[in-house]
Amino acid sequence: MPSFFLKQKTLIYIVIFSYFLTGCTLNKALFNGNNLNGWIPYGTEKWYVENGELICESGPNAQYGYLKTKKNYKNFILELEFKQEANGNSGVFIRSTVDGTKVSGWQVEVAPPRKFTGGIYESYGRGWLIKPNPAKDSALKMGEWNYMKIKVIGSSITTWLNGTKMIHFTDKKIGAGEGGIALQIHDGGGIKVRWRNIYIKEL
């Protein structure tokens, strides 16, 4: 085979390999740092952008509030950072659905110390499904930026907080779930949580 065709064939292989390599490592930003494009707020609590950060804050009604993606996500790796101010009781919902202003689904807890951050809670259902070992509570840095990773595949959820594996849980009901990703602010008032660097990789 002439060298010209060998070079062309090699170039094609390089392009194809690069395409698949990029596709396997590409993460999509769910928050653009400028506005709430791609998200829908539910409830009367405050959701706004400040200095490139997404902020949720208790509103006048001090009720539950949610910010949900317009798109649904089934199997994925979600990575984000959060910083709790004041109470800091919040959460990240996966495969969540909406009924009026009520968001149901499975919540990865984001809460003050000794309140099981990284555990899984089923809202409007069975309640706590799994809580992290209390010895792992030290992974939470209250008042500082925390890195959370959530992996959802089929019926299984695994969570990490600042590099510490918090839980791994498998459940048929979760496996059958369909819906979007939602951030939550707890009721009760006096809550403020900052979010940034929210990225997803669909699997």
Predicted regions and their residues:
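Bacterial N-terminal signal peptides that target proteins for export
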Residues: 2-12
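Prokaryotic Sec-type signal peptides and long signal-anchor helices
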Residues: 8-9, 21, 35
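Bacterial N-terminal signal peptides
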Residues: 13-22
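Carbohydrate-interacting regions of secretory-pathway proteins
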Residues: 24-203
